[in-house]
Swiss-Prot record:
Residues 2-42 are annotated as: Polar. One of its GO terms (biological process) is reproductive structure development. One of its GO terms (cellular component) is membrane. Keywords: Acetylation, Lipid droplet, Membrane, Transmembrane, Transmembrane helix. Belongs to the oleosin family. The keyword Hydrolase does not apply. This is Oleosin Zm-I. The modification N-acetylalanine is found at A2. Residues 8-25 have a biased composition (Gly residues). Pfam families: Oleosin (PF01277). Residues 1-30 are annotated as: Disordered. The N-terminus is blocked. It is found in: Lipid droplet; Membrane.
Length: 156
């Protein structure tokens, strides 16, 4: 801010600065004054902003108290209607959310099945093929064991 008083060479305190009582010592005093002014300006801004917020919070508190004072008798009178209505709305919202979630799950299952049946190899298709092979193997083992027991029963 004080750069416009310096010479064209951009040096520190020149001869003119010394005549005005400046020099290096005067420049330090000026910077100290500017720092103090900036601190005072910041403090004033913070106090103004903080005071405004304090006033607004007081007004909001007063408005809340007034609104509760007015609304409490109305809520007490209508509570036999409002409480069941709120419960019904909550149940309806839960039903819609559940329905939507199950619908999305069904669509994803149908999409996976379509990809699997058309041979596009969806995620976990290898696991399904492995499980299918193990199930078929176990079914053959059960069939062979049953056939063996039938043959033993007929042979005895």
């Amino acid at each position: 801010m004080a750069d416009h008083h310096r010479g064209a060479t951009g040096g520190g305190g020149g001869y003119g600065d010394l005549q005005r009582g400046g020099g290096m010592h005067g420049e330090a005093q000026q910077q100290q004054k500017q720092g103090a002014m900036m601190t005072a300006l910041k403090a004033a801004t913070a106090a103004t902003f903080g005071g405004s917020m304090l006033v607004l919070s007081g007004l909001i508190l007063a408005g809340t108290v007034i609104a509760l004072t007015v609304a409490t008798p109305v809520l007490v009178i209508f509570s036999p209607v409002l409480v069941p209505a709120a419960i019904a709305l909550a149940l309806m919202a839960a039903g819609f959310v559940t329905s939507g979630g199950l619908g999305v799950a069904a669509l994803s299952v149908f999409s996976w099945m379509y990809k699997y049946l058309t041979g596009k190899h969806p995620p976990a298709a290898d696991q399904l093929d492995h499980a299918k092979a193990r199930l078929a193997s176990k079914a053959r083992d059960v069939k062979d064991a049953a056939q063996h027991r039938i043959d033993q029963a007929q042979g005895s």
